[in-house]
Amino acid sequence: MSEFHQIYDPLGNIWLSVLVALLPILLFFLSLMVFKLKGYTAAFLSVALSAVIAVLVYKMPVSMVGSSFLYGFLYGLWPIAWIIIAAIFLYKLSVKSGYFEILKESVQSITLDHRILVILIGFCFGSFLEGAIGFGGPIAITAAILVGLGLSPLYSAGLCLIANTAPVAFGAVGIPISAMASAVGVPAILISAMTGKILFFVSLLVPFFIVFLMDGFKGIKETFPAVFIAAFSFAGAQFLSSNYLGPELPGIISALVSLVATALFLKFWQPKAIFRSDGKAASFTKSNHHICKVYVAWSPFVILVLVIVLWIQPFFKDLFEKDGLLAFSNFYFEFNNISNHIFKSPPFVEADQSASFPVVFKFYLINTVGTSIFLAALVSMLVLRVRVSDALSVFGETLKEMRYPILTIGLVLSFAYVSNYSGISSTLALALTHTGLAFTFFSPLIGWIGVFLTGSDTSSNLLFGSLQQLTAQRLHLPEVLTLTANTVGGTLGKMISPQSIAIACAAVGLAGKESDLFKFTVKYSLIFVAIMGVVISAIAYLIPEVVPAIK
């Protein structure tokens, strides 16, 4: 069977090669921002162009391009789309039962102010879900809840994408950092510690920035005490846990500390002027619902948390290992014509080394986040006393609403894997290593590009981690800093990742309106990654002693 060795400068001039490699991304941007095409149309055009470039410019065999496309599409369906289907199904069950109205009233008993509700739900609760499950589920769940609480769909989706910036690096129990650390041979605690130091300021900024987007400086002034409590408690807990515990728990710990601290503070303080994004007058009549009904109303999300906690336990994961009790539920399909037949080339590997891509589609029927959410939905169905016929109707409605978002997600992941396996995405990253001492400024941009293309900080770190490390060594820079830059830069690209955009739009009923959401977030993402470039450069050249040394 033929082998394919990636080439990163197919035209013999790195900048010409970059220009060609950029074409699919530019087409995607133009499709959404200028031509206002639907997400699945933009994704299809981009993946089609990337496939043509992969074959004609990068000399990738057509069969390998086809397999890369199919693998990406399948990965988009399972586990990504399955997570979103399950999350929306859970939310819709709550609405169908009528208990969501009781939940809404209980939330509004904490505060009626939409600015603070976005912090509690989008930032605090969303960060907890990101720390536990990741994969877009937190955005879908929190955005849907905020719409139910009266915020507009576009607002809810956009603000939740921005709120999701702070916890992404430590998402899914720290996998983005631990996976990269293992791949590059650097202790995970060092990258975790440096990430916590840099994200301290990001985590402080994000809640205030969310309020600013909603209500300007007036909003910050009116809500400052509560937002400060949320931001500082989150940033402080994230800093301490990332520096002393490692990458696994900061996302969960910081979110819980912030959520509890803010909710307790709001028992004693409320903003004088209540802000409602829908322009309606703030009014709240204390409900006469029995406390048991309130507990039942919250039960879907309490059950979700409990199931997630179970799903991430080592003893539970061991059940799916070889010869484990539930190992039968794991299915593997290897793409024989590309698995271990696509090879990385220097400088992504050392000159005397060889690295290939194992391409195995893993269909984990039970051991996947989507199934944990779906199980929570089934248990919630019993607690909420939703009839089976109604639940089936809700599930069918969810699938119908998700048909175009599912197509979009599949095409986006196909685009990602065609770009990754052909070497197109690596060309973009490699060009930035030619910037010499300015590399520190562009280092976060590499992670940003990686997450834009793949939708995953983990994938970006695995894709570009070795490049960041080798470039740092050649430029005599602290490699922990550039590895951290890749991780943090990736978190800033999450809000414009086509995958994230598609998920958020699906959750709030804006399927086909991806261009509106993309325009809302792209400018902030670009500003943030530019600021991060300045921060990384300042650390590298002014205060390098704050970077943990590899012993």
Where are these predicted regions, by residue range?
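Alpha-helical transmembrane segments of multi-pass membrane proteins
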Residues: 115-127, 153-166, 187-207, 410-411, ...
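Structural signature of hydrophobic alpha-helical transmembrane segments
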Residues: 9-23, 76-80, 133-138, 189-204, ...
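Re-entrant/interfacial helical elements at transmembrane boundaries that shape
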Residues: 137-145, 161, 174-185, 430, ...
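Membrane-embedded alpha-helical segments and adjacent helix-loop junctions characteristic
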Residues: 66-152, 385-471
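Hydrophobic mid-bilayer segments of alpha-helices in multi-pass membrane transport proteins
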Residues: 20-29, 37-59, 81-87, 227, ...
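Transmembrane helical segments that form the transport core of multi-pass membrane transport proteins
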Residues: 281, 288-446
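Juxtamembrane and boundary regions of transmembrane helices in multi-pass small-molecule transporters
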Residues: 2, 169-279, 488-551
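Juxtamembrane helix-boundary/capping and inter-helix hinge elements in multi-pass membrane proteins
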Residues: 95-100, 112-113, 146-155, 182-189, ...
